Swiss-Prot record:
Pathway: Pigment biosynthesis. InterPro entries: Fungal_Meroterpenoid_Isomerase, NTF2-like_dom_sf. This is Ergochrome gene cluster protein CPUR_05425. Disulfide bonds: none annotated. Part of the ergochrome gene cluster responsible for the typical purple-black color of the ergot sclerotia. The ergochrome gene cluster produces several ergot pigments including the yellow ergochrome secalonic acid and its derivatives, as well as the red anthraquinones endocrocin and clavorubin. The pathway begins with the synthesis of atrochrysone thioester by the polyketide synthase (PKS) CPUR_05437. The atrochrysone carboxyl ACP thioesterase CPUR_05436 then breaks the thioester bond and releases the atrochrysone carboxylic acid from CPUR_05437. Induction: Expression correlates with the formation of the sclerotia and thus the pigment production and is directly regulated by the cluster-specific activator CPUR_05433. PANTHER family: AUSTINOID BIOSYNTHESIS CLUSTERS PROTEIN F-RELATED, AUSTINOL SYNTHESIS PROTEIN F-RELATED.
Length: 153
């Protein structure tokens, strides 16, 4: 049974605030110990990742982007299902090129409602197709593995 709506709403507000402030500790601090992250669309074939694999990636991204701004367009919260969706446009400066990502983040709250259990992120694929290779080259690493490659197929 999902947590009370007020508890979820407080967590959602903290999540959006940390995202707007682009604060790694506050943002990641809201993730549960069993947190999982999935990049959408599913057709991209990227694997679901646990907290310990995603947190360093977020810290790196947060450390790379400067003058970060988040324009939240819509928030939908379904407390009866323990879920919320945030649609926003993020913009920032980076050494590898300007960042402007239109995205929707789908979150599932923990049973207690005070943590984020999972996050699924749908990005602007046209932008990310151009920007991601520059970002990965700037940091000296290749693209994350696809689900197929991660499974050893």
């Amino acid at each position: 049974m999902p947590a009370p709506a007020e508890v979820q709403q407080a967590t959602l507000s903290k999540f959006v605030d940390a995202w707007k402030r682009w604060n790694a500790d506050d943002f990641i601090g809201l993730w549960s110990d069993s947190f999982t992250f999935k990049v959408l669309p599913l057709s991209d074939g990227k694997p679901t990742r646990p907290r310990d694999k995603v947190a360093p990636l977020y810290r790196n991204l947060i450390g790379t982007l400067t003058d970060y701004k988040l324009d939240v367009k819509h928030i939908v919260h379904d407390a009866s299902k323990g879920k919320a969706c945030i649609y926003a446009v993020a913009s920032a400066n980076a050494p590898c090129g300007d960042y402007k990502n239109e995205q929707a983040i789908f979150i599932t709250f923990s049973e207690s409602g005070d943590k984020i259990e999972s996050m699924e992120e749908m990005n602007d694929n046209a932008f990310r197709k151009e920007w991601d290779p520059k970002y990965h080259a700037y940091h000296g690493y290749g693209q994350p593995p696809t689900a197929k490659a991660a499974a050893g197929s």
